[in-house]
Amino acid sequence: MLISLALLAGCDDRAAMAARDDGDPMQYGGVSGLNYTPYYIHTFNVKGHDDNGISGGGPNIQPASPDNMPSGGGKETCCASFHKKWRPGLKVTVRWIANKKLDGIAWGAWYKAEAEVPEYGTATYGMWAIFLPGDRVKVMIKDGNANGHNRVWARPADDDPYVGTGTVDEELTRQDEERREKQRQMKIAREAELAREAELSKQHETTQ
């Protein structure tokens, strides 16, 4: 299931602000990711809890290198929304597709994890999701590491309190599998129809 994002104009990482009804201003930025796992990540999305306004979806990310260097970071998608001013308790749910079968055929399963966004400064440069072994993930707002929590290229510590541990999202995976099976059956039916049309056309030509 592809998660669609509203494409917002002017997706500068320093971002224009949008005022919320509660007076808590939001801003927009790009979404990027790093992958420390050996598995391909097809897509991911972030959604805030309790309608806190945080949202975003990121690009696909290749597996980490054999020497455990992360992949990703070279591209971003538009756009994430997050608070101009950080406050404690900004929690999000992250969902992503990871292909662990490594057979080049399987699509992979959806995973989900809950995490809290660490403190960030006022000069921000977009949202980042850092995927770690053990189905773990950290979501941060890049800010030049103003408060010591958001060094994008430093692997989070194993005991980092802002790292959430995920589980398979059984329902979303099932829905995705059903959708793909329906598409597969439609493709088979269409190919069979085209084959019948070709055979009828061939028979018609031989009778002329």
Where are each of the predicted segments found?
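Sec-dependent N-terminal signal peptides
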Residues: 1-5
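Bacterial signal peptide processing site
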Residues: 11-15
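Structural beta-strand segments of beta-rich domains
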Residues: 27-29
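Asparagine-centered strand-capping/turn motif at beta-strand->loop junctions
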Residues: 32-36
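Short acidic/proline- and small/hydrophobic-mixed sequence motifs that coincide with surface turns
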Residues: 41-42
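Tryptophan-paired
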Residues: 46-102
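Beta-strand-rich cores of mature extracytoplasmic or soluble domains
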Residues: 87-208
